[in-house]
Amino acid sequence: MKDIKWSVVVAAAPRERPKLQTTIDCLNKAGWDDPVVFSEPDSYVSTARTVHNETKKGVWHNWLQAANFALESGADAIMTVQDDITVHPESKAFAERVLNDWPRDAGYLSLYTPLHYSVIKGNKKPWGIYPIHTKSIWGAMCLVWKPSMLRQIVSSQRARNWIGVRKQIGEEEYAERVRNPELIRNLDTVLGYIIHKDLTKKTYYCNPSCCQHISEDSSIGGRAATGKRAARYVAGEEGNPRPSEIPVPKQEPKKAFLL
């Protein structure tokens, strides 16, 4: 197994009850020693290396900035993270195990799996990794990427032109977002559209979840991380397998980790 050079980027925004330092500490404990935070104005300042935005970029453009930074790092693998998560200490080793048996049709591997992605008809899905079939993905909290795929994402026509879901916003709001790009959000939605519809790839999730969403408030308004906004089965908790115990399907040699 080759040593994998990582670039981990964290998108941070102002919160009444910030969790950023908890996120950084968890990443460090898992072995990601140098995450870089991309911080919106008035955000909590952590101990991590930080790029401070002088003006507000908003959810979408701050994430794009972070993703492009990671792509310029020369890393073998990239992880894009939100500022209100925890990860199990074995998460990096698990992610590298998957990277070395990377599914050919994968858009990304999410270390975070919300409740409704871990059950089917009310019953727990088997432990392992599997693609999710959905029109719109939910929760881009902690995503592992091959650089070649992430580069396709950020350079895609949909990413360049993304304003939001036209069916969900009126003409007035659409025009407002065009004038003020910092209002553009729906990160998880656009990633799902590009991966599923445009690139015809799949989004992979792990069960149990290696990551938990711990927010007590939303940076864009809304409720705390409960119900479908949190993981139901968390690795290493309540008798669930640790990340090192989650089965990873073996791929044929030509399907292994290739940049």
Which sequence ranges carry the predicted segments?
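An acidic/histidine-cluster motif and surrounding catalytic segment
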Residues: 1-81, 85-259
